[in-house]
Amino acid sequence: MEPDGSGTWSDVIQRFNDLHPDARIHMVEGPPATNTREDMYSTAFLSQSGGYDVVFCDVVWVPKFVAAGWLLDLSDRLPAADRQDFLDEDLKAGSYRGRLYRVPAFTDAGVLYYRKDLVADWPATFDDLKKFSERFKDEKRWGFLWQGKQYEGLVTNFLEVLWGYGGDWIDAETKEVFLDRPEALLALQFVKSTIGTISPPGVTTYSEEESRNLFQDGRAVFLRNWLYVWALTAREDSPVKGRVGLVPMVHAPGKTSRATLGGWGFAISRFTSNPEAAWKFVEFITRPDQLQYIHERLGRIPARKSLVPPEFEPILKAARPRPAIPEYAQASDILQRWLSAALADRVSPEFALREAARETRLLVGP
């Protein structure tokens, strides 16, 4: 699991253990970085270790883990009523080649937060975002914050701009790569143009929390981040309480806003010696009452239609998954490296995208 600083996960697991003394769950806390937790699971599964019965599984791990034969097929275990209540895109993201391997728990999507006390009419296009950022930034406040560190967050940020220009990355079915198309160049040029103008020079070192803390301290007009930020800005001790709105990410004229789909769910290791007990826990922790409790404690958005707050519905309808390919981690690493090189002025955007496209084609094949 992720680090349990609030004790929320421990509370839920204790409830399960009290109800099922014959199927007790022991929580293993992993490191905070998602890719490091992925490595933790991968190392165990490569040795066919049964040390992990249940996997708290990121949306992008499913194709890799399934292709490697590490997860149990859960297609015939999930009741029809639950299938109807879980969000469609989250069910798809937990599936591979038509079979379900991960039961959704929490959904997520990229969103644009803005200071509604400053901006009366929120931006719809990339040009609007620049214009409004320039108008309202000052010596104490930047215009636009995002996540530019070399990690998966950079990919999710870039994809939303890329999709907003009408472009794409990889077609999971045909393995076609689109990174050397004009739309990708426009997207990277836009992202690069924000650095030092409407975004701080240090934005290329920011992950979610660095950018969120600055925005929540009142030091920016706009923030691209995930849905969890909404609850944090509304807390009593938040300096921007009651002054924040959220809208879909901006897009090019004539194009459509798209958000990167994120989210977490629960899968079962193929190497478990306790598949029935593991399934009991997956059933329990994805129940509406447990997901609602975690939402109230952590701000996580339940992946059930019956529990999604209405203000998030337009955002989630625009959410799009990243390519469901077993080579996803390597493809993401390629894109991260070349985007970072271009943002740091080590290479031109044109060169970065051309090389990223070439390496990605070699990786995924025709």
Spans of model-derived segments:
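Conserved N-terminal structural module of periplasmic/extracytoplasmic solute-binding proteins
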Residues: M1-P63, A80, S238, P253, ...
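Short, solvent-exposed loop/beta-turn-alpha elements that line the ligand-binding surface or hinge
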Residues: S75-F86, G148-K149, G167-L186, R235-P239, ...
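Extracytoplasmic/periplasmic solute-binding protein
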Residues: Y101-A105, G110, K130-V177, E183, ...
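Conserved C-terminal helix/tail region of periplasmic/extracytoplasmic solute-binding proteins
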Residues: K317-P366
